[in-house]
Amino acid sequence: MLCEYDHNVYNLSRQVAELVTKGQEHPYWCYGSWSVVYTHAPLSQTRRVSVDMAQRELHWMLSGSGATQQDRCARITPDVERMWSPWATDTLGPMYGVQWRYGGPGGLYDAVQDVVDRLVANPTTKRAVWTAWQGYEVGSMRIPPCPVVWVFNVVGGRVNLDIFARSTDVVCGLPYDTLEGWMLIHLMTNTLNYHGHEVVPGQLRFTTANAHVYCQNLDVWH
């Protein structure tokens, strides 16, 4: 019988195999769309994953920083460094953490704090949402964000998170996008417990409109 971890790895392996063999072909990649649900920490094994680096990147996002690419590239391991080299220098612009903490007109809207406040006041709220996508600012971003919407739901005392991505590099990006999502669930669970709500971590559902594997990265996947 497969344990939960093995089951997640098996399902992801099967989905990637189907993506490569049955997905739409493009001169540079194969692509499709999918949704995957995790009830335990998602270590997907499509690349080497550093929990410490995932924590550092999530901290960087939650801090609202977007000044340098160095923090984001700290997560890169040597075998996939070439995948991110086009974005390894220069500034990121107003993406990810900037949108999370300094969004809206004049950068005065803290979406993360707004979600925390809503959940603390009413854990069953259906309005615990933040986004990293502002169309009018995409042109100022070094690269547009891939995960774009985060939605928290508390059902039956369990803190769940839905992440929607416009685009997902299955080999390079998915392992960290899902692991950091799982960390967010635990951070929100701890926050709600601190404020007197009795909740436990629930599930992470990651949905992407365009899951893709770049042809030059197939050797990393194999």
Located regions from the model:
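Terminal, non-catalytic protein-protein interaction segments that mediate quaternary/complex assembly
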Residues: M1-H222
